[in-house]
Amino acid sequence: MMNETRTTIDQDEIDRFSRIAAEWWNPKGKFRPLHQLNPTRLAYIREKICLAFNRDPVSLMPFENLKILDIGCGGGLLCEPMARLGAMVVGVDAAQTNIEVAKLHATQSDLSIDYRTTIAEALADKGEKFDIILNMEVVEHVADVNLFIAATAKMLKSQGVMFVSTLNRTWKAWGLAIVGAEYILRWLPKGTHDYKKFLKPQELKNLLSKNALTVIDEIGITYNPVNDSWNRSKDMDVNYLLLAKRP
C-alpha cells in the first residue's frame, strides 16, 4: 500500500505548474528554456539508449519494444519524441492539468502515449517495470527526494537505465537558475525553484547507489548566451545529468 505519512507530493509545486499548464507547447512561452534544452538532452538520451540496448542509432525507430517511463512528464515534451522513436511510453505527472494538455497534444499529433495522473510511489506500488526511466528536472520539485528516488529505482528492470537531471546546489546555480532565470531574464515564473532542494552530484549519486543503481555516465549542460543555445559540457556547476544502470 502507498505510504500514508510520507509522500513525494509538494502541493505548492503542483499548483505552480498547474497554473501555467497551457503554456507547455508554446516554444516562446513560460517553458521556452525547456524547448531550447530539449534538442541537447534528446540527442544525449537517444545516444545512450542505443548504446545500452545495442540499437542502431540511425534507425527510424531505434526504441521499438522498449518501455519508457517519463516521470513528471509535464505536457509531454519528452514523451512525444520517445514515442516517435518507437518506444512504448508511459508519461505520469501529479498535476491533472498537465496530463490533460499532454493527452490533447498527443491526440493532435496522432501519437499513442499512455498518460496518467499519479505519483512515483503509487505507480511503484503497482509493480510496473520499465527498461528506461526519464527523471528529468523533477527531483528539485519533490517533497521527499529519498522516497522519490527509491520509488523510481524500484520500477527499473534489470539492465535498465535511468536518466536523472537536476540543478547543483552551488552559488553559481543560485545566481543563474534563480536570480538570473526567474528575476532578471524572467524566463521562468518567480518561485519555480527552491535552492534548498538542489542536490550536489555526489548526493544524488549516493541516493542512486543506495537503491542499487550504478552511475555510468555524467554530463553538465550549459547555456551559451552568444548563440542562445544549450550544450553538453564538463561543467556540472549548474545543470547536470546522471545516467544510472541497474545490474
From Swiss-Prot:
Q: Where is the signal peptide?
A: none
Q: Which Gene3D superfamilies did the record assign?
A: Vaccinia Virus protein VP39
Q: Which CDD domains match?
A: AdoMet_MTases
GO MF entry, a single one: 2-polyprenyl-6-hydroxyphenol methylase activity
**Catalytic reaction(s) noted:** a 3-demethylubiquinol + S-adenosyl-L-methionine = a ubiquinol + S-adenosyl-L-homocysteine + H(+); a 3-(all-trans-polyprenyl)benzene-1,2-diol + S-adenosyl-L-methionine = a 2-methoxy-6-(all-trans-polyprenyl)phenol + S-adenosyl-L-homocysteine + H(+)
Q: Which InterPro entries match?
A: SAM-dependent_MTases_sf, UbiG_MeTrfase
The protein's annotated pathway: Cofactor biosynthesis; ubiquinone biosynthesis
Judged by the first EC level, this protein's enzyme class is transferase
Superkingdom of source: Bacteria
For the biological process aspect of GO, one term held by this record is: methylation
EC assignment: the record states 2.1.1.222, 2.1.1.64
UniProt-annotated binding residues for S-adenosyl-L-methionine: 41, 72, 93, 136
Q: Which keywords are on file for this protein?
A: Methyltransferase, S-adenosyl-L-methionine, Transferase, Ubiquinone biosynthesis
Q: Which family does it belong to?
A: Belongs to the methyltransferase superfamily. UbiG/COQ3 family.
Annotated function: O-methyltransferase that catalyzes the 2 O-methylation steps in the ubiquinone biosynthetic pathway.
Return the HAMAP family for the record: UbiG
Return the protein name. Ubiquinone biosynthesis O-methyltransferase
Species for this entry: Bartonella quintana (strain Toulouse) (Rochalimaea quintana)
Q: What is the lineage of its organism?
A: Bacteria, Pseudomonadati, Pseudomonadota, Alphaproteobacteria, Hyphomicrobiales
